[in-house]
Amino acid sequence: KVIARLSLEQFTKDNKRTAVVLLSLAASLSVYFCIVTMLDSQAARTIVSNYMDTDMVIKNDTACKEKSEDRRDILDDSFVKSIKENAGVSEVHSMIFAEITVPWEPDFAEMWMKEFYAKWMSIPYSKEKDEYQNHPENFGSSLIGIDEQEFDYLNNSLTHPINKEDFLSGKACIVYRNGLDLSDADIIGKNVTCALYEDQQTAKTFTIEGVTDENYYTALLGYPPTIIASDQVVKTFANHPITLKTSIKYHKEYDRDTEQEILALLEKNDNAKDFSWESKIEDADEIEKAQGNMPQVGIGIVLILAFIGIMNYMNTFVVNVQSRMTELSVMESIGMTPKQLLGMLVREGVLYAGGAWLVTLTVGMGVTYLLYESMNYRGIAFSVPLLPLLFAVGISFLVCTMVPVLTWIILEKNGTVVERIKGVE
């Protein structure tokens, strides 16, 4: 307790000097913290994240062609099966789609179309309302079908999750908001009726229980809403739904061998020119190429600042110990053991390191967060890179405790206790 009290007294003895040392260390640590956070957030593997964190999404480019006769179900069951049979593939999820109309009715359809025209159209809804009422086939939209796993993922992202059984049974659906200024409360609970585009007599009514802003679930974006339902319900309702896209997840993330095998399947397919894909690996490669030497430059800046901060601390503490040689020698002469003396110096170092990190993790983190959000155009969640942070904590505490200890060990060799008290060289 006495040693701890002496360390604290020395730490608070010269507030101005202590503040300068703490701020110097905290500034270096804060810049380090800021740079490693930015580098981690902009790393290719952090930026790149396909929907559901899949490794590849294969798209059927014919699915959204304007003329229905030009659309072909090229992502058929046999092709998807060949993907599933690949040893490196862990999950495959296909999204199906059918073109629909949403017949006019005075409640939800009317509200939706009014808002759609107000938001996106240059002409008033009143000018085209009659056409919509009498010829809904001129206002096509999409019915999207997703499997149970994709539903679970989507449902977890909703502000108001929906009943799974209602969704799978076909009682409930989710609607894509399409950027309209309609709240969940405006939409949820209303009924929406859709009819097959090629057969207006075949219709189905859903209760809207959820609303999403995720544009992954879109095909032909028409004026009426895009409806998302269970794929089994869509298959029962529609005559020939088309597979719009297939997402693939590998057992091993960023597995280039598996990806090459999938791409080989695409190239061998007779419809190769009608496929497109999004690849996490390709996106990461593009980002790394675009970033060039940015990570190395950032690390270089971090090392320079760390060196400056450490040298500043060393210089300050060496001078501090030198100026206290007489005081420390007197303590040693009246019975303080070398172990106790070194323990006191170590505690002082811990106080400096702890104080610097306190400033870094409050003020420094606040500044880092503000800078991060100002440049966060991709909407990546703020997170602290734990390993670089723990590394910096370890190094800073090691330096802050070892510098005073080594300084004392070197300086005490300059003479006996009596000589040091008298100030003899």
Predicted features along the sequence, with ranges:
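Feature of multi-pass inner-membrane transport and sensor proteins
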Residues: 1-22, 384-388, 406-425
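Alpha-helical membrane-protein architecture signal
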Residues: 3-8, 12, 19, 280-290, ...
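Short, strongly hydrophobic transmembrane alpha-helices
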Residues: 15-41
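Alpha-helical transmembrane segments of integral membrane proteins
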Residues: 21-31, 295-315, 352-360, 391-392, ...
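Sec-dependent signal peptide cleavage junction
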Residues: 36-50, 317-320, 373, 407-415
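Basic-flanked hydrophobic alpha-helices used for secretion and membrane insertion
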Residues: 40-298
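Short helix-loop junctions at transmembrane helix boundaries
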Residues: 284, 288-291, 340-344, 353-419
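Interfacial "coupling" helices/loops that link adjacent transmembrane helices in transporter permeases
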Residues: 309-351
